């Protein structure tokens, strides 16, 4: 039997770089919220112990794909602790809507959905804490998708505190470029000393993203989309880009602006949600 699982996008409602560690990783403060929009992952169980991704992602080797790595990691961890039946495997396919290098967390979300779904389908019985710990070895953003609740994140993004920001409507626009995260984090002009503040203080301040100034400077497409959106609503970069988003109180307001968008602006309208669609599907 084939089952389908949501793999939602996320937005960074704000993102501040507070320092850089000796190992080169940046410390940050950010606010994650999910969107009711994303990829869909389909899983069909196998009984020969094999993991097969039936829909390869262009430019990514099969064994390097986060979906495959997540499945193999869960398989090994569960088998080593005697919590996996012999022969457990899976055929996995993905209906991909989220762009790569867009700052929407697509790859991390895919990995998290596979961990959560296969843990359920294989009846491994691993806790969310165990799955989140495994997810962190795959990427800093994976744990928030595993846990499935909007969160304030610190450290390198791994220290999570559940929060409930307002669930606004967003027009999310993709400028048509992919921004590799290292391009932003290696830029010498990236602000790296934003003062740390409490979540209570941050929620009262106007939200912004320290990476935005670099993305706009290095990618004129990002600058063009943001300049257009800012004419209509508060707008900013998500993650390290390339996607940007404008914030609205209602769906109709967001759709009215999207309808006026120039042809070169590709976007969609989605609602911010504090409970991940993946976890909502499991209730």
Curated annotation (Swiss-Prot):
Molecular-function GO terms, alphabetical: 4-(cytidine 5'-diphospho)-2-C-methyl-D-erythritol kinase activity; ATP binding
Q: Which GO terms describe its biological process?
A: isopentenyl diphosphate biosynthetic process, methylerythritol 4-phosphate pathway; terpenoid biosynthetic process
Q: Does the keyword Kinase apply?
A: yes
Q: What is its EC number?
A: 2.7.1.148
Keyword GTP-binding attributed: no
Broad enzyme group: transferase
One Pfam entry for this protein is GHMP_kinases_C
This protein's UniProt keywords: ATP-binding, Isoprene biosynthesis, Kinase, Nucleotide-binding, Transferase
Q: What is this protein called?
A: 4-diphosphocytidyl-2-C-methyl-D-erythritol kinase
Q: Which organism is it from?
A: Escherichia coli O6:H1 (strain CFT073 / ATCC 700928 / UPEC)
């Amino acid at each position: 039997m084939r089952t389908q699982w949501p793999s939602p996008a996320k937005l960074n409602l704000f993102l501040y770089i507070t320092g850089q560690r000796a190992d080169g990783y940046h410390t940050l403060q950010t606010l994650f919220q999910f969107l009711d929009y994303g990829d869909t992952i389909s899983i069909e169980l196998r009984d020969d112990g094999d993991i097969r991704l039936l829909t390869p992602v262009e430019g990514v080797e099969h064994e390097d794909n986060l979906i495959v790595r997540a499945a193999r990691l869960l398989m090994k961890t569960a088998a080593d602790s005697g919590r996996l039946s012999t022969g457990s495997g899976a055929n996995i396919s993905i209906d991909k809507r989220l762009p790569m290098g867009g700052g929407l967390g697509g790859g991390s979300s895919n990995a998290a959905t596979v961990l959560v779904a296969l843990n359920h389908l294989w009846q491994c019985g691993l806790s969310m804490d165990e799955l989140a710990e495994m997810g962190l070895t795959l990427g800093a953003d994976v744990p928030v998708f595993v846990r499935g609740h909007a969160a304030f994140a610190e450290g390198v993004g791994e220290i999570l505190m559940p929060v409930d920001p307002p669930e606004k409507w967003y027009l999310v626009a993709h400028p048509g470029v992919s921004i590799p995260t290292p391009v932003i984090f290696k830029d010498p002009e990236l602000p790296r000393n934003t003062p740390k503040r409490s979540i209570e203080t941050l929620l009262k301040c106007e939200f912004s993203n320290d990476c935005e100034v670099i993305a706009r400077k290095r990618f004129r497409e990002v600058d063009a989309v943001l300049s257009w959106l800012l004419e209509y609503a508060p707008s900013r970069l998500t993650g390290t880009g390339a996607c940007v988003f404008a914030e609205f109180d209602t769906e109709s307001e967001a759709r009215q602006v999207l309808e006026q968008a120039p042809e070169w602006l590709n976007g969609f309208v989605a609602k911010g949600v504090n409970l991940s669609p993946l976890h909502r599907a499991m209730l």
